[in-house]
């Protein structure tokens, strides 16, 4: 019954009913709940209107009447729940339309503003919840949709479709599409039904056109959801298909294009996923054909093809076929099918279609039989698009029908189509003919005759004639065709066969081939001419050498005239080329053949003066020759010339060829003659490659013409030929080619050279490579020396550099790689240096600072840098390293600002690269700096790093070891060079000094990269070798040692091992540690040895960190012994050295729990504590604040770069002046982390130093957050051993936080004695004591989380000790530090003490903690005695402070301890009232204004009032007796004006106390109020004034509740309205105004008359 009733009530719970409840639900899309509660109707309306105005600018559809109506001013206070059903339905229509129009813009903030108004005013989150859910569902993966779901008032449990969304509303996370897809399958596809219905409903509201234009995301989501159902083919069952088919049908029939496309995509995916039954397939095909629309006809037919390809469709229904034949006029089905046939396989479709068409054509009763034949003919009209299977199918169908008596008469087009198919697909035709011939040979013959394709049978038979048997050969004599067949032997057969061969029957050529050919040309006997041409080709050059030149030229002219210009096709061009390939042609004759003789042509050669015989070519072709004929002649002649191995060459021939190229360039339609250009350019290239005796120079090679052709051509073959021509020309005229080479590099022009495609780029790339190789190696017949080759390379590279900035950025890589392949690794660095030199030669210093900054990394430098980096990237990594080394050495050879005196041959090449004598000093400096910067970029190149990483350890050692030591040496030399130049600056030139400092920094970066780029294995070997040399050699290279140690540090610190694959061998690490131990000595004199000791300590620290933990190691034990020995002498040693050794010792303690570390832990800790104490003494505030910068303490200043390096850790980070302190703290922390139980006796000293450092370097409250054991900072700092990375206070704070963490883990039983000692030691240091109690509070909280029971028992035992020996001795500070400037600090100290007491209270029960409170009360209570001294009386202040802190933390839980404290508060108020107590002896506390005594008295009164005020909050505790106890003293405080701060005390503290007392005892409030009003009759104006202030504030607190007490107030106010003191009168008027504001104007008029 209960269940039924619940169900009925739930059904009645409508949206309107829910909004009629007492509490209105505050819902917002843009604001959180707290802000939504404050959102007024007017504000929501303004937000909505602002959003609507913005949406109108985005989409004009929002500028409509209904929108204005929805957003009108009248709707501000609209209450939807009061609407009737009809009005609500009408409103729903308006809202649904607006939501549909908003949905595409959900992620626009203006849309969210509109939704905010609709949610607030129309409660659409409840009334239109499902509409909101569906409308914006396509945005399910956005945050805003998640927020929208969260605010919906939707019954998720009752909705089977959307129940899955409830889990996402709780977390407010976006909904993945996979979740929706799973829910769709689990809900039996009802979600798809909902979305489809939503789309239909949307069409009814906004129309299909609007929906299709504005909501593509909705259709995409619908289709995507449908497709998701096919991801698992096993789940596609009958039920799913039954659900899907209606969606598909509705989609195909839909007038909306997007819906149709969605349905087609679903069909395609469905047929690809599963095999469908025939009835389903027929239904789909029928839908696609019968519901085809013009705008999606191509897509429908494409989908149909997919169905036929993937499924086995056997037939089409008659009605479907008729619909296909009688399609709409706007749909050209057969044209679309033809286009599809060219792109995809349509075999299955046409096989079925043709079969159905033939069946329909036989139906005499059908009106479509003729149309079927027409369509059949149209679909087989183009045989070129048919496949073999299609051809076989159509041939078999038509021939089979013919054999069955169904001949398509009077269809000439069909006969021609069948014939074309049979000819094109002879093999298929032959197979079908053989198949049908076996059935009925005679009938088939008649059918073939009827279709007039009998000859195709013979054609097909000949095609397979090769399969005839050779067992018997029938030889029939030509002269005796009727002779009998003779059976011959094998030898006789062979002899007869040879005699009957074509070779035996060949006629023997007699006579001169040229004369015969000329005779046959005139007689147009073309086969004979070709015979003669073949004879010429066989006779070859010997034949032509015996012929007269004029005869040969005359014959060539005849051939050109007949074949080239006349266009005779019977003569094969190949025969002509072969025949004339050996002819010795005069270069002048060749030039004439390529010339047009019209008297005005620009390409005609100049004639010499005097009489001259008429040119034979001109005589043949005349001056009236058309350009078309001339072009035909030129193409033919060029074709002949290109067929020759060597073309007759001369200056005139080259000029004529270039003239042909130019003539084509001058045409508007250049591409139509690209073949002619192609032939001409190839001919020029052949001449340049084989010039014979012709001298070719710059004047003969028209490079301008070639470049112009390259710029304008769109033919990649011609482009390739032109680039090859440039390479060939480079052998003869390198200077001219180089001058024009810019166009090659910069891709100028508007033709194909400009295109960004692989073909163009590969052509240019190969050309550039060949060009460089050719120019470098070409020098006539002489063999170039190495230096000559380098000189030519420098010259070419400099010319290339001039055009480098014009090369597009995306093409630079390929060009640079091509150059790298040409110049090889040995010359790569030279090219790079020339590039940089060219850039710096053009560089100008800008006077404008902003422009100079912009020029630092301008586009020009980017271009040069990119080319250089890509050029080197083409080399293998070891070649790259070698090239970079050469560049570094070049920089070093270049020298400083002053040039070197001596020069060598090597210097000559250096000068060619960069001639410093021809450059200004700024450019020399810039060149040097740019080279070093470029080297840095090369080392940072990811390609180099990845290639090195691809090698294994063995290959790296083999290839890189020879380079390794040189890399180290080079880095040292670079460093020393920069250091020397920087130190040589005397300061007279600030600009030079700045430059060399910057250059030194840059070289340092390069040096580091040089070293650190070395692979791990090579680095390990180098480090071992160098250190061994340093140990064995008396003249140790400390500089080299420093570098290798830095390398070791990077490898150990970053990679954690030296070998990438196998990891470093433990034995090798120990060996390295043994070598380094020798440098760990207490050095005080040699700076190099001191620096070496520091570096070795750092490296040993990393080794200790990476070595496996060992119980005992002789090497590390020796290291530990050395560390302790050095640290013990810290007063004589450098602080940085001592700090590094301390870090090493700390790491040994942390990483290796050995006997030696335990043994030395105590002595090491004592030394660390001593150093910390000295640091604390040294870091006294005045001295510390005035201390010099860290760098100033180092001798030599910035001028000595070695000293600057010394101030840095090996990681490159600066040490501060507190280095030793940080290192000592680190070591202390390590000791306490590992061996706290062994060094218990030093705990007190550690705590003392910890507290003093906290007092000096940071506020404890700020550090508290750092030191929580559960905080993320603990985890972040756990693994670090370096301290130098933390600067100054940050590093100290970090170490102090870690020490605090260690102290928090010490057992409580050992702490009390140390805490008591600490309190005694720090009794005069307030900040240090605050740090101590912060530590104790943290300790209690930490232990309470980890060991609550053990802690509770320990605290119970130690609570009295804590009060007597820790807490109360600290609170005495108030009586000892009685200075005004320390007053606030004392308060802060007490606050930290009481925080500790409160932390104890949190773990004890009420009874257990009462002992602590009683102890404190007993400690303070003697201060109330008359004879008590000032120190005892000040204890009362501390007690009241504690009471208020206790209440703040525990509220009402603190009241059980307030009994006696409340009484003490009343007594304090009474005994501190200087107005009522006339004698000073009777006063508890008193003092003159501005004195410390006045501050203490004011504080005591304030705390006492607050105690009473806090107690009065709780009626149960604040009984009538207690109310009476405090009422008089509280009211009497009104007259206590003699104590400083009276007015503030009254307004801020006294008024709340009185108000709360009145609330606690309402019956006594009138009496209390009357006592207050009686104070207004005091003779002292100040008291009257203060009483009125209290009254005014009290009325504000009470509010309307003051009305019952007006009868008490009015008489007193009447008296005061005309007070003799103007200030009192004004304050009285303010009180009256306040009452008038509450009770009206008539209030006071009535009261005054009364």
From Swiss-Prot:
Involved in nucleolar processing of pre-18S ribosomal RNA. Involved in ribosome biosynthesis. HEAT repeats lie at residues 1609-1645. InterPro entries: ARM-like (IPR011989), ARM-type_fold (IPR016024), BP28_C_dom (IPR012954), HEAT_Utp10/HEAT1 (IPR056473), U3snoRNP10_N (IPR022125), UTP10 (IPR040191). Pfam families: BP28CT (PF08146), HEAT_HEATR1 (PF23243), U3snoRNP10 (PF12397). The gene is toe-1. This is HEAT repeat-containing protein 1 homolog. It is found in: Nucleus, Nucleolus. GO terms for molecular function: snoRNA binding. SMART domains: BP28CT. Keywords: Nucleus, Ribonucleoprotein, Ribosome biogenesis, rRNA processing. GO terms for cellular component: 90S preribosome; small-subunit processome; t-UTP complex.
């Amino acid at each position: 019954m209960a269940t039924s009733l619940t169900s009925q009530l739930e059904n009645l719970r409508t949206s309107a009913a829910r909004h009629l409840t007492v509490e209105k639900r505050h819902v917002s899309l843009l604001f959180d709940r707290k802000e939504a509660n404050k959102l007024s109707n007017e504000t929501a309306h303004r937000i909505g209107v602002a959003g609507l105005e913005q949406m109108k600018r985005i989409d004009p559809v929002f500028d409509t009447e209904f929108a204005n109506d929805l957003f009108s001013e009248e709707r501000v206070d609209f209450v939807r729940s009061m609407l009737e059903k009809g009005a609500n339905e009408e409103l729903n229509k308006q809202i649904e339309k607006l939501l549909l129009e908003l949905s595409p813009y959900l992620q626009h903030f203006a849309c969210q503003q509109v939704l905010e108004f609709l949610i607030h005013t129309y409660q659409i989150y409840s009334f239109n919840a499902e509409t909101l859910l569906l409308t914006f569902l396509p945005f399910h993966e956005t945050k805003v949709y998640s927020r929208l779901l969260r605010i919906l008032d939707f019954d998720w449990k009752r909705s089977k479709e959307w129940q899955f969304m409830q889990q996402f509303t709780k977390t407010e996370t976006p909904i993945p599409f996979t979740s929706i897809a799973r829910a769709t399958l689990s809900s039996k596809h009802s979600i798809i039904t909902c979305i489809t219905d939503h789309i239909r409903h949307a069409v009814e509201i906004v129309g299909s056109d609007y929906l299709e234009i504005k909501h593509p995301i909705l259709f995409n989501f619908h289709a995507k959801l449908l497709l998701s159902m096919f991801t698992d083919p096993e789940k596609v069952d009958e039920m799913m298909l039954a659900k899907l088919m209606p969606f598909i049908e509705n989609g195909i029939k839909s007038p909306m294009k997007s819906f149709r496309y969605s349905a087609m995509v679903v069909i395609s995916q469905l047929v690809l996923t599963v095999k469908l039954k025939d009835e389903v397939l027929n239904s789909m095909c029928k839908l696609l054909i019968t519901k085809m629309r013009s705008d999606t006809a191509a897509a429908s037919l494409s989908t149909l093809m997919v169905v036929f390809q993937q499924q086995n469709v056997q037939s089409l229904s008659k009605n479907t076929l008729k619909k296909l034949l009688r399609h709409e006029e706007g749909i050209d089905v057969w044209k679309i099918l033809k286009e599809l046939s060219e792109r995809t396989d349509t075999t299955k479709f046409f096989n079925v279609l043709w079969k159905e068409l033939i069946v329909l054509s036989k139906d005499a009763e059908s009106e479509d039989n003729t149309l079927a034949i027409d369509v059949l003919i149209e679909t087989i009209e183009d045989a070129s698009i048919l496949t073999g299977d299609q051809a076989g199918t159509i041939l078999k169908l038509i021939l089979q029908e013919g054999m069955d008596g169904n001949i398509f008469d009077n269809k000439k087009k069909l006969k021609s189509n069948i014939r074309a198919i049979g000819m094109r697909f002879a093999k298929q035709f032959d197979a079908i003919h053989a198949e049908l011939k076996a059935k009925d040979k005679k009938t088939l013959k008649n059918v073939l005759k009827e279709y007039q394709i009998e000859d195709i049978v013979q054609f097909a038979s000949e095609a397979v004639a090769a399969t005839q048997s050779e067992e018997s050969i029938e030889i029939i004599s030509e002269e005796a065709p009727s002779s009998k067949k003779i059976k011959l032997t094998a030898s006789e057969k062979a002899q007869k066969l040879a005699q009957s061969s074509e070779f035996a029957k060949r006629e023997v050529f007699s006579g001169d081939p040229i004369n015969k050919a000329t005779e046959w040309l005139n007689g147009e006997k073309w086969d004979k001419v070709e015979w003669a041409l073949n004879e010429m080709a066989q006779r070859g050059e010997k034949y032509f050498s015996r012929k007269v030149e004029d005869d040969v030229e005359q014959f060539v002219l005849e051939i050109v005239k007949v074949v080239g210009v006349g266009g005779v096709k019977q003569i094969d061009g190949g025969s002509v080329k072969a025949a004339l390939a050996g002819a010795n042609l005069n270069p002048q004759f060749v030039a004439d053949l390529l010339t047009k003789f019209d008297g005005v042509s620009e390409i005609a050669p100049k004639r010499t003066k005097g009489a001259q015989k008429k040119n034979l070519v001109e005589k043949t072709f005349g001056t009236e020759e058309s350009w078309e004929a001339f072009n035909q002649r030129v193409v033919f002649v060029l074709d002949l010339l290109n067929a020759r191995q060597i073309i007759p060459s001369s200056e005139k021939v080259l000029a004529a060829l270039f003239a042909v190229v130019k003539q084509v360039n001058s045409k508007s339609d250049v591409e139509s003659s690209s073949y002619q250009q192609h032939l001409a350019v190839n001919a020029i290239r052949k001449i340049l490659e084989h010039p014979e005796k012709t001298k070719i120079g710059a004047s003969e090679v028209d490079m301008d013409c070639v470049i112009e052709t390259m710029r304008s051509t769109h033919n990649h073959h011609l482009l390739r030929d032109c680039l090859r021509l440039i390479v060939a020309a480079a052998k003869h005229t390198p200077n001219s080619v180089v001058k024009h080479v810019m166009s090659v590099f910069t891709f100028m022009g508007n033709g194909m050279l400009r295109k960004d495609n692989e073909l163009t780029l590969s052509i240019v790339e190969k050309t550039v490579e060949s060009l460089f190789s050719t120019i470098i190696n070409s020098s006539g017949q002489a063999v170039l020396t190495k230096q000559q080759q380098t000189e030519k390379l420098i010259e070419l590279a400099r010319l290339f550099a001039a055009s480098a900035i014009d090369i597009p950025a995306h093409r630079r890589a390929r060009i640079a790689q091509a150059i790298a392949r040409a110049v090889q690794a040995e010359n790569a660095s030279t090219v790079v240096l020339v590039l940089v030199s060219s850039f710096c030669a053009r560089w100008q210093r800008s006077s404008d600072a902003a422009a100079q900054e912009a020029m630092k990394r301008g586009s020009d430098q980017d271009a040069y840098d990119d080319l250089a980096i890509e050029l080197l990237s083409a080399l293998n990594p070891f070649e790259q390293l070698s090239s970079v080394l050469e560049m570094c050495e070049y920089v070093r050879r270049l020298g400083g600002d002053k040039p070197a005196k001596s020069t060598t041959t090597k210097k000559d090449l250096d000068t060619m690269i960069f001639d410093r004598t021809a450059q200004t000093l700024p450019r020399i400096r810039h060149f040097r700096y740019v080279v070093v910067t470029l080297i840095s970029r090369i080392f940072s190149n990811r390609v180099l790093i990845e290639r090195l990483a691809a090698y294994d350890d063995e290959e790296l050692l083999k290839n890189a070891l020879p380079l390794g030591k040189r890399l180290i040496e080079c880095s040292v030399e670079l460093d020393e060079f920069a250091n020397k130049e920087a130190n040589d600056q005397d300061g007279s030139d600030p600009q030079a000094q700045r430059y060399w400092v910057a250059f030194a920094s840059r070289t340092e970066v390069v040096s580091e990269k040089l070293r650190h780029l070395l692979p791990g294995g090579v680095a390990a070997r180098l480090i071992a070798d160098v250190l061994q040399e340093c140990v064995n050699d008396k003249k140790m290279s400390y500089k080299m040692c420093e570098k290798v140690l830095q390398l070791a540090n990077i490898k150990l610190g970053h990679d954690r091992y030296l070998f990438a694959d196998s990891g470093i061998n433990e034995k090798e690490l120990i060996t390295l540690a043994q070598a380094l131990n020798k440098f760990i000595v207490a050095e005080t004199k040699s700076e190099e040895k001191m620096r070496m000791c520091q570096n070795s300590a750092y490296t040993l620290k990393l080794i200790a960190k990476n070595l496996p933990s060992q119980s005992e190691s002789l090497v590390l034990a020796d290291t530990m012994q050395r560390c302790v020995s050095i640290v013990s002498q810290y007063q004589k040693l450098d602080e940085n050295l001592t700090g590094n050794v301390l870090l090493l010792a700390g790491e040994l303690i942390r990483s290796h729990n050995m006997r030696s570390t335990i043994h030395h832990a105590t002595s090491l800790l004592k030394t660390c504590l001593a150093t910390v104490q000295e640091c604390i003494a040294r870091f006294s505030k005045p001295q510390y604040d005035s201390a010099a910068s860290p760098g100033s303490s180092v001798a030599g200043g910035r001028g000595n770069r070695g000293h600057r390096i010394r101030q840095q850790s090996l990681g490159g980070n600066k040490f501060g002046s507190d280095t030793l302190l940080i290192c000592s703290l680190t070591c202390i922390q390590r000791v306490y982390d590992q061996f706290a139980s062994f060094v218990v006796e030093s705990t007190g000293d550690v705590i003392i130093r910890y507290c003093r450092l906290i007092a000096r370097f940071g506020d404890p409250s700020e550090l508290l957050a750092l030191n929580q054991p559960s905080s993320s900072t603990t985890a972040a700092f756990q693994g670090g051993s370096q301290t130098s990375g933390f600067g100054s206070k940050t590093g100290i704070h970090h170490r102090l936080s870690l020490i605090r963490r260690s102290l928090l883990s010490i057992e409580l039983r050992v702490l009390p004695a140390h805490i008591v000692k600490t309190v005694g030691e720090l009794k005069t240091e307030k900040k240090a004591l605050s740090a101590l109690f912060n530590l104790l509070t943290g300790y209690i909280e930490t232990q309470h989380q980890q060991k609550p029971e053990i802690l509770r028992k320990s605290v119970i035992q130690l609570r009295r000790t804590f009060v007597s020996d820790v807490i109360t001795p600290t609170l005495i500070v108030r009586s000892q530090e009685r200075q005004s400037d320390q007053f606030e600090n004392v308060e802060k100290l007490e606050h930290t003490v009481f925080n500790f007491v409160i932390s104890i209270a949190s773990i004890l029960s009420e009874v257990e903690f009462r002992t602590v409170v009683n102890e404190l009360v007993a400690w303070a209570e003697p201060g109330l005695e008359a004879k008590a001294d000032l120190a005892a009386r000040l204890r009362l202040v501390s007690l009241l402070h504690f009471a208020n802190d206790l209440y703040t933390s525990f509220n009402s839980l603190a009241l059980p301890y307030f009994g006696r404290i409340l009484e003490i508060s009343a007594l304090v108020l009474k005994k501190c009232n200087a107005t009522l107590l006339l004698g000073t002896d009777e006063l508890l506390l008193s003092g003159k204004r501005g004195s410390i005594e006045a501050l203490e008295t004011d504080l005591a009164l304030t705390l006492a009032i607050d105690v009473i005020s806090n107690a009065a909050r709780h009626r149960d505790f604040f009984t009538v007796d207690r109310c009476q106890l405090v009422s008089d003293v509280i009211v009497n405080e009104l007259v206590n004006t003699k104590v400083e701060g009276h007015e503030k005390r009254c307004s801020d503290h006294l008024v709340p106390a009185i108000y709360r007392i009145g609330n606690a005892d309402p019956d006594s409030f009138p009496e209390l109020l009357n006592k207050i009003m009686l104070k207004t009759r005091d003779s002292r104006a100040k008291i009257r004034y203060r009483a009125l202030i209290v009254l005014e504030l009290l009325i504000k607190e009470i509010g309307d509740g003051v009305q019952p007490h007006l009868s008490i107030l009015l008489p007193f106010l009447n008296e005061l309205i005309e007070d003799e003191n103007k200030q009192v009168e004004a304050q009285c008027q303010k009180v009256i105004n306040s009452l008038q504001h509450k009770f009206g104007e008539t209030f006071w008029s009535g009261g005054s008359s009364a």
